[in-house]
């Protein structure tokens, strides 16, 4: 998938499915990108060729900046708010329910909803540049 909402790419080799996401705004995750990641995880979970899912993001900066700030600012009513917050819930549930091991590769800052992705992983490999922050705790 490639759109103005970012990209999700998948490659399967020797039983390992490598899933990589990218968004130009520090790998933030707008709704369509979250939905695509959840769909891909569910699909790989039922693929008999796949034994392990390796999840990561592109770039050398942030692993994941969390939710799309523009989408958060655009919430005008309860229905829109519910849809916004269900995006991460849907992805995290897909990861938790996936019968394959999910190994997440973290290479930089991980903020907000990105922390949920890390927590939903079976294993996490982090570089020395990785850091985790829940911005909600700064309030």
Question: How would you label these PLM feature ranges?
Answer:
Residues 1-56, 93:
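Conserved CoA-thioester-binding segment of acyl-CoA-metabolizing enzymes
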Residues 19, 55, 68, 117-119:
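Hydrophobic/aromatic residues within transmembrane alpha-helices
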Residues 57-91, 110:
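Glycine- (often His-adjacent) and acidic-residue-rich active-site loop
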Residues 91, 95, 105, 111-139:
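CoA-thioester-processing core
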